[in-house]
């Protein structure tokens, strides 16, 4: 098996978006990348691979409890929504917030932190409190509903 580094994930996100743009059954102006955890970090990191002036293949990005340890500030003008749990031990929101504070003024980012939510807050198969390695993860119905509402509102503003 060939090991795959998470460094390639942002490039994969953009490659898939560019591929989808070429498909006749896809409305190319409406492609949104959505990721959870490491995938959430990947969709945000994909923005770092775009220049401010570049015509992005992405209409928007949504990141659920993104893993931001290696995330760098970006210049791209693509709207982004980040949904995080204040109690997240796997992907602490403070790590993302430090990056978000370095974004250029006018960056189209909405960051929401749900006070009682943990990593996996929208995974209804999880109990509210479960061990994941040395960290605690868990479902939070209130955060799941609030995040779903937030995504719906965010996406309704991003459609033609």
PLM-predicted stretches and their roles:
Residues 2-24:
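Alpha/beta-hydrolase active-site loop
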Residues 25-37:
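Alpha/beta-hydrolase fold nucleophile elbow
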Residues 40-53:
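Short glycine-enriched nucleophile-adjacent loop
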Residues 53-67:
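A conserved short beta-strand
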Residues 82-84:
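Short beta-strand/loop motif that positions the catalytic acidic residue
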Residues 87-91, 119-120:
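Acidic catalytic loop of the alpha/beta-hydrolase fold
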Residues 92-102:
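Short alpha-helix in the alpha/beta-hydrolase fold that links the catalytic acid
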Residues 108-160:
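C-terminal catalytic histidine-bearing segment of alpha/beta-hydrolase fold enzymes
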């Amino acid at each position: 098996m060939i090991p795959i580094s998470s460094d390639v994930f942002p490039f994969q996100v953009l490659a898939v978006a560019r591929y989808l743009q070429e498909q006749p059954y896809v409305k190319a102006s409406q492609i949104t990348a959505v990721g959870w955890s490491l995938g959430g970090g990947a969709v945000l990191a994909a923005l770092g691979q775009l220049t401010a002036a570049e015509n992005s293949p992405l209409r928007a990005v949504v990141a659920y409890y993104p893993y931001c340890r290696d995330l760098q500030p970006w210049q791209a003008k693509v709207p982004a929504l980040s949904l995080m749990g204040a109690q997240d031990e796997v992907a602490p929101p403070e790590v993302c917030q430090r990056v978000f504070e370095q974004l250029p003024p006018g960056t189209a980012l909405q960051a929401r932190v749900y006070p009682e939510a943990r990593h996996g807050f929208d995974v209804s198969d999880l109990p509210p409190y479960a061990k994941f390695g040395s960290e605690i993860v868990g479902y939070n119905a209130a955060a799941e509903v609030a995040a779903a509402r937030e995504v719906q509102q965010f996406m309704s503003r991003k459609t033609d």
